[in-house]
Amino acid sequence: LPKDSEKRHLYELGKQLFFENGYVEIGMDHFALPSDSLHKAMEAKKLHRNFMGYTAGKTELMIGLGMSSISDSWYAFAQNEKDIDDYTKKVNQGIIPIFRGHLLTAKDLIIRKHILNLMCNLETEWNVGLGAQVKSEIIQRLKAIIDDGLIEISENKITVKEEGSMFVRNIFMAFDLRLIE
């Protein structure tokens, strides 16, 4: 398997080939032609992301079928059994083969919206649901990225600059309070 530096080089090479063939970057590791519905959704700020990748509209419900699949009802996640024997046993017994799940809290939903805004629009508005303390914690986690000039932060908004777009995962991870807890 390639090392991290080789992976980055392969990604940049692939990105260049996409650009040379008329594709545009629409999100993390995703490309589309300008005529594609994904690009149009990005331009209209209606791009959405779910477990399967980017979509041209919000996914209200996603039902995962099969072993290890993940379902998302927007307010909760559920993952099916990952082990084939456990999965088959539950299915044969007529039991829904859920391995684990999580109900999202009101705070989770606010954080989720900010993360999706960053993933899909490379910006999010601070004044939506975040308290001063949480904003301060997020800014502390983003300090190195701020110092490198990869994002702009104003009183009401955080915007990922073009040169920061390749670090959007690192940026939105600062919003995920569960990674810190």
What are these language model-derived features?
Residues 146-156:
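A short, conserved structural fragment
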Residues 163-181:
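Short, amphipathic alpha-helical interaction segments positioned at domain boundaries
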Residues 1-128, 132:
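C-terminal scaffold of the Radical SAM
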Residues 157-161:
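Minor-groove-contacting beta-hairpin "wing" of winged helix-turn-helix DNA-binding domains
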Residues 131-147:
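Short amphipathic alpha-helical interaction segments
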Residues 8, 136, 162-165:
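An alpha-helix initiation/capping motif
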